[in-house]
């Protein structure tokens, strides 16, 4: 079972306790040593699995995740991505949403340049309101979107950010 697929059930009965468990280590396992460590950055904003709002970038943002973050920041949203965006190296793999990434259930999902391929949308089935901004009017994401804008994300997103700033005074 993947995280975020089902609601968490209330605990019943007596509280559980944890006991330490000693595991013997073989000589071969003890000989293993760390040869390198690589730091990876994390997507900005709250954790994807816990975020109430998630702004996701897909192929249509063409690598411009600063654009995605520009909308996520005023909404205090997590930044996510499609597999294509991660495969292209535009954002770290920890931001990937879908079959081979995270499963999320935000109250608000905003997809920027996301086509809506099933390997991505399977990871957002628990989303409340889905907003799609994509220049392809035939993109499958519009079938599941509550609100959709057919347009170029590089033109639409700056207008949204400007309007958010105006509304917040």
Annotate each language-model stretch with its function:
Residues 1-169:
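N-terminal glycine-rich FAD/FM-binding segment characteristic of electron-transfer flavoproteins
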């Amino acid at each position: 079972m993947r995280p975020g697929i089902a609601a968490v059930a209330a605990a019943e009965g007596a509280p559980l306790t944890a006991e330490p468990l000693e595991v013997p280590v073989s000589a071969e396992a003890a000989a293993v040593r760390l040869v390198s460590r690589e730091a990876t950055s994390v997507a900005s904003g709250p954790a994807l699995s816990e975020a109430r709002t998630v702004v996701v970038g897909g192929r249509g943002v063409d690598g411009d995740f600063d654009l995605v973050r520009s909308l996520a920041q005023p909404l205090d949203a997590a930044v996510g991505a499609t597999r294509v965006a991660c495969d292209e190296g535009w954002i770290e793999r920890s931001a990937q949403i879908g079959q081979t990434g995270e499963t999320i259930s935000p109250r608000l999902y905003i997809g920027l340049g996301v086509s809506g391929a099933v390997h991505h949308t399977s990871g957002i089935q628990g989303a409340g309101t889905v907003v799609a901004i994509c220049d392809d009017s035939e993109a499958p994401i519009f079938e599941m979107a509550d609100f959709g804008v057919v347009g170029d994300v590089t033109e639409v997103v700056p207008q949204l950010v400007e309007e958010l700033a105006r509304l917040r005074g």
